[in-house]
């Protein structure tokens, strides 16, 4: 029997940054390539890197606001243009950079009139603000705005719940993710008789770290996940002897349902973070959706085809375009 030779590339894999730019203080962009890869490897690496970049990179943000003068979240403060809710939303958008662990205290103590911006936040030494010009509130009268802040470093999302509300203390929906978006694409080519691939990876960050730093941290996280397999000895996988048998945990239907509910919740949170601005839709479709207050992918998927056709100036062709573009027709009931 003649065995086919398996070709293995002798060239060393190399990462290279082919484009890097700063669009604003809160939007960094980087484009990287990895090559040469064997057929199928680019997709494997691209999917893994995208998941880690979006879900495993730690970030820092404001998670709680406290003030004894605030009766409830939807109240207003005399002498301040914004409502308490609007101030909380502005604080949520503040981008912070730090290497802290645990929780730190910060504060704002501003005497009006004047504009309160991110530079007015009194921070601990381990934390710095990425964009000092970010707006918080407009104090229109000579009154004091004094609030206490909690700052945390974590990963992913934290949605505020009723349990987290305390007297004069209000939690903020925390988005710890410093990576705003990730795209990967693959270029295939033939090198002699061998099919090879180049992986292109695009990374957008919020300015708290550069795309290159995010790529380094994601790579390190992936390596840490696989290190236990490198240290495992062969006899640890020998299940022939009774002493090496593995006892599997028992799951009840309640456990299974709880996990499924958690999975759906995580998916919903992820869809909330994808804005239609990122979908590169035609201007006319994009403007129609915006006018109908559809801003995220989750909001778009919550509309049926009939709902979309009720939008002013929206046509059947537009609905078909969206279905074809997203390739997720099954999500529309």
Swiss-Prot record:
Subcellular location field: Plastid, Chloroplast
InterPro entries, per database record: DNA-dir_RNA_pol_insert, DNA-dir_RNA_pol_RpoA/D/Rpb3, DNA-dir_RpoA, RBP11-like, RNAP_asu_C, RNApol_insert_sf
Major location (coarse): plastid
Family the UniProt entry places it in: Belongs to the RNA polymerase alpha chain family.
Record text about domains: The N-terminal domain is essential for RNAP assembly and basal transcription, whereas the C-terminal domain is involved in interaction with transcriptional regulators and with upstream promoter elements.
Subunit composition and interactions: In plastids the minimal PEP RNA polymerase catalytic core is composed of four subunits: alpha, beta, beta', and beta''. When a (nuclear-encoded) sigma factor is associated with the core the holoenzyme is formed, which can initiate transcription.
Protein name: DNA-directed RNA polymerase subunit alpha
Organism annotation: Glycine max
Gene: rpoA
